[in-house]
Amino acid sequence: MRRSTILIVVLALVFTASVGYLAGAAGSGAGAGSGGHQISTPAFSRVVFLSHVNDPDVIPGFPGDPTFSLKTSFTVAKDGFYLQYVKEGEHTGTHYSAPCHFHTDELCADQMDPGDFILPAVVVDIREQTAADVDYRATVADLEAWVADHGPMPQDAAVLLWTGCDAFWGPDRGPGTVSYYSCGSGKGGFHQPGFSLASVRWLIDQGVLGTRGLLGTDTFGPDPGNDFKYRETSLTLHEHRFTLENLTNLEALPATGAWITWGGPRNAEGSGEPSTVFGLIP
């Protein structure tokens, strides 16, 4: 057996055992948040990254957010060890948003349960619609078509919108240029596809977004670029639900059957955190 194969098997076994332990701890009241439920996961054969590398020369910052920077503070040659100083906002690069990001009476990053960070994944492919309309809003009909093709969506799931906009990841290079800020369309201003408000309500009504769950996307966020009230995000961020933003490599996941897990620092009263996101593929 190749070393890489052994590593994947070991990771899968460790992950499955960890999920069982964490779910049991949450269910017994030992978790940091308000409880949890048992989680049953399949065996996994492959692990993939779903997050971008944070490179200050490449990373596109959301308009108005703190600028990301990396500075070398210590080197092996001079100090005997290497360390960088990181300056960033909580919503830098690939990241998650906690419910308190939009609501003063909801949970923050340090109050979530460990089981909140491990979810079955649903990948909804709207690349064709996005190519025709960069401001496309995924509809209830899109979700129902997914169900017709793949069967019922799991409860408390991570619903990931695959738009293809991550292909244009990079800084803003000025008006009229091909960039992440317009999903490669060359249009001026801010343009990206997202979920329609009706589709988010449908996911909640169906229990796909239940006590747990999230909306994820390979854009700046779940909201269409022309929705400056962020209604889709606001509706999602309640109870133990998240949004995952600036994802990449969604083509590596099957439409159904994979799981995702992610993590970052647990800042006190954090509104979210930059995250490394993993796709776990059966």
Task: Enumerate the predicted regions with their spans.
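Active-/binding-site microenvironments in catalytic and ligand-binding cores
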Residues: 2-8, 21-282
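Bacterial N-terminal signal peptides
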Residues: 9-18
